[in-house]
Swiss-Prot record:
It is found in: Cell inner membrane. GO terms for cellular component: plasma membrane. Its main location: membrane. This is 4-hydroxybenzoate octaprenyltransferase. The gene is ubiA. PANTHER family: 4-HYDROXYBENZOATE POLYPRENYLTRANSFERASE, MITOCHONDRIAL, PRENYLTRANSFERASES. The chain crosses the membrane at residues 23-43, 46-66, 99-119, 141-161, 163-183, 213-233, 234-254, 268-288. The keyword RNA-binding does not apply. It comes from Escherichia coli O1:K1 / APEC. Keywords: Cell inner membrane, Cell membrane, Magnesium, Membrane, Transferase, Transmembrane, Transmembrane helix, Ubiquinone biosynthesis. InterPro entries: HB_polyprenyltransferase-like, Prenyltransferase, UbiA_prenyltransferase, UbiA_prenylTrfase_CS, UbiA_sf. It catalyses: all-trans-octaprenyl diphosphate + 4-hydroxybenzoate = 4-hydroxy-3-(all-trans-octaprenyl)benzoate + diphosphate. Catalyzes the prenylation of para-hydroxybenzoate (PHB) with an all-trans polyprenyl group. Mediates the second step in the final reaction sequence of ubiquinone-8 (UQ-8) biosynthesis, which is the condensation of the polyisoprenoid side chain with PHB, generating the first membrane-bound Q intermediate 3-octaprenyl-4-hydroxybenzoate.
Amino acid sequence: MEWSLTQNKLLAFHRLMRTDKPIGALLLLWPTLWALWVATPGVPQLWILAVFVAGVWLMRAAGCVVNDYADRKFDGHVKRTANRPLPSGAVTEKEARALFVVLVLISFLLVLTLNTMTILLSIAALALAWVYPFMKRYTHLPQVVLGAAFGWSIPMAFAAVSESVPLSCWLMFLANILWAVAYDTQYAMVDRDDDVKIGIKSTAILFGQYDKLIIGIFQIGVLALMAIIGELNGLGWGYYWSILVAGALFVYQQKLIANREREACFKAFMNNNYVGLVLFLGLAMSYWHF
């Protein structure tokens, strides 16, 4: 019986950290890899790469824990989230706080192996991860904060490699914010009706009938900024082909969200994993001269 209870608790932690749903970690991973490949260029040190990949998974898990902790009073009223570990009672509030601290401490220990500039930037990363879940109560722009949180690994990656944050770094950071607002608005479109009822704010609610148009504008902005980064860094044909493929994926997403159906909007959100992957492959091909 003791083992059964322990096993159930571990499974609840597993669900709380979303390790059963890797999409969030992947959307955080791709911009991190973009930054490491541009900063190095193309040949990141193995230890730095390992630290950032591990950090992505750990901090994404920590972000999910604090997000569910912040939303624990609301999730029970939303059909999609009612069975999450905190509202269902599978994990207590005290356990969630302890798990968050453990994940953050492990992440910080990894960062301590890097240079001072990266360590200082990591403090801002923690602040963004903590603040984001609470923003949806006070502003319709929590997706902007999410974009900053998901993109903060970009200046950290540049700092870890060269102890500098050049123009390409900040253009990539801005591109990631636009991309995050676009894909998280698609995600928020799934819960829009429930969010209106319980008073949760989002860009999906703010944009209203113009949601598809604004998502499209942001997607074009992502492609334009990534093209500028390619020009600044002298990237090759493989990279620009990847931008074209990413553009085709964005067109496909627009087709999916055309009627604002929940399942289709969620499918569009999930499709962004391929956008990140394609752009990374383009960078790899450019630097490796395939």
